[in-house]
Amino acid sequence: MTDTQVTWLTEESYDRLKAELDQLIANRPVIAAEINDRREEGDLRENGGYHAAREQQGQEEARIRQLQELLNNAKVGEAPKQSGIALPGSVVKVYYDDDEKDTETFLIGTREQGVSDGKLEVYSPNSPLGGALIDAKVGESRSYTVPSGNTVKVTLVSAEPYHG
């Protein structure tokens, strides 16, 4: 498995997501009981409570699967050791389209990390921008395509391990 397939998480983020997963799993019997209670109310075709409970169950099961996959593929607390190369877990600074004044600083990681201060944007290594920057060295320019179809050039100014 390569680093771009691995989700880098801080210890705090991992613990928060694990607690959410544990809560959702613990809630399974409650949802099942709710569905059974609603089923006993009669005709299922006209039973809004039953359908709402089934909908909630589906949403919670989808979130459980998402969290399990995320946590199973997580690298916890292992920020890249090296500076100067954009890797998952790096805080990078870039400038756009040869305009050195148009800069942005962000973490290459996952929004699930919930960077606590809220001041640092997070771009997934699977996003167009994050993916374009993976393995870029300081001073290197890369291009990526935005959803509108336009191509944007970005140059890596700095890359440092995240110390959250």
Swiss-Prot record:
NCBIfam families: greA, PRK00226.1-3. InterPro entries: GreA/GreB_C_sf, TF_GreA/GreB_CS, Tscrpt_elong_fac_GreA, Tscrpt_elong_fac_GreA/B, Tscrpt_elong_fac_GreA/B_C, Tscrpt_elong_fac_GreA/B_fam, Tscrpt_elong_fac_GreA/B_N, Tscrpt_elong_fac_GreA/B_N_sf. Pfam families: GreA_GreB, GreA_GreB_N. Residues 11-76 form a coiled coil. Belongs to the GreA/GreB family. GO terms for biological process: DNA-templated transcription elongation; regulation of DNA-templated transcription elongation. One of its GO terms (molecular function) is DNA binding. Necessary for efficient RNA polymerase transcription elongation past template-encoded arresting sites. The arresting sites in DNA have the property of trapping a certain fraction of elongating RNA polymerases that pass through, resulting in locked ternary complexes. Cleavage of the nascent transcript by cleavage factors such as GreA or GreB allows the resumption of elongation from the new 3'terminus. GreA releases sequences of 2 to 3 nucleotides. It comes from the Bacteria. This is Transcription elongation factor GreA. The gene is greA. SUPFAM superfamilies: FKBP-like, GreA transcript cleavage protein, N-terminal domain. Keywords: Coiled coil, DNA-binding, Transcription, Transcription regulation.
